[in-house]
Each structure stands twice: as structure tokens, then as C-alpha cells.
Amino acid sequence: MVKVICDSTGDIRDLAKEYDISLIPLNVLFGEESYEDGVTITPEEFYKRLVTDSRHPTTSAPAPGQFVELYKKLAKETDEIVVLTISAGLSATHESALQAKELIGNLCKVEVVDSKMTCGGLGLPALKAARAAKKGDSLKDIVAMLNDALPRIRAYMIFDTL
């Protein structure tokens, strides 16, 4: 069965286990303090810090080595993985996933898909991919479904302030 990886910006932490989706966290930085999104800082803690901390948070992509570790772990269960990432235009996460794919060689087949979005625009296709994997769809079919669906998905955000 195809395994699905989504980065933490997809905001599906509560559904990931149910759908057998592996999450890879981006790093959240408040000044010199670094946290793994959804692992060492919860969304609730993040939003509280956003209001109370004078330092503007930044993010950084997972290192290729983090993807390599996850690919190797999943390769013990499958020989096919699909990875959905935050937009390559917003983060280096997509590039890290591609570098890791090269680093593992022929250990397993990995397809990295740029969602060209974040938040629900990334999380919903990841859930759709996981459902397709569970029913036995091939990696090729899942990637084709994602490439068909992603251009038709829109995500909107509203901010109190910039």
C-alpha cells in the first residue's frame, strides 16, 4: 500500500493517525528558540506566543535528513511513498523532500508533489491521497489524481493584521 507524507502546514494533525498519514514538521522559530511544528509546540501554544511574544515568528524547512529518516522508516512497510508539501514558492520543504528522494536512491519509489498551497489547501488533498491509498490505488494513480485535483483547489485566509 502507498504511504502518504504531508508536512505539518497541512493542519491535519488530529486526522493524520486515523488516515495513516505521516507528518513531517516544519521548524517554528521565535528568535533563537526553535520548535518542531505540532511536536514541540502545539498550534494553541503557537497562537498564544504570537500574541504575547514580541518576536515575530519565522519558519524553516525540515532538513533533507529528516525526510531521509522518514522515507527509510516507511520503506520497511512499503515500496511506494507520495509526499505532499507546502508550496515550493513559500518554503524550501519541497526541495528538501526532493533532495532526500535522491539520497535514498532505489530504497523505495518516492513521488514528491508540490501542493502550491498550505493549510487546508494542502491537508485536504493529503486526506484524499490517503483514502485512495487505503482502497488500493497505485502510486501512479494517486499522483495523477493529485495533479488533476490540486489546480482546482483554493484556500483563503483572513488575517486580523499584517
Where are these regions (language model features)?
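Regular secondary-structure segments
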Residues: 51, 126-134
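Glycine-rich phosphate- or other oxyanion-binding loops that anchor nucleotides, phosphorylated ligands
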Residues: 52-96, 143, 150-151
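N-terminal glycine-rich anion-binding loop in soluble enzyme alpha/beta folds
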Residues: 3-63
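Short glycine-rich or small-residue beta-strand-to-loop segments that form or flank ligand, phosphate
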Residues: 80-87, 111-114, 128
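Short, ordered loop/turn segments at secondary-structure junctions
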Residues: 9-10, 28, 86, 115-117
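Short Gly/Thr/Asp-enriched flexible loops that form oxyanion-binding sites at enzyme active sites
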Residues: 85-105, 123-127
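Short, acidic/small-residue loops that bind anionic groups at enzyme active sites
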Residues: 101-121, 134, 138-143
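Internal, active-site/partner-interface "lid" segment
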Residues: 131-162
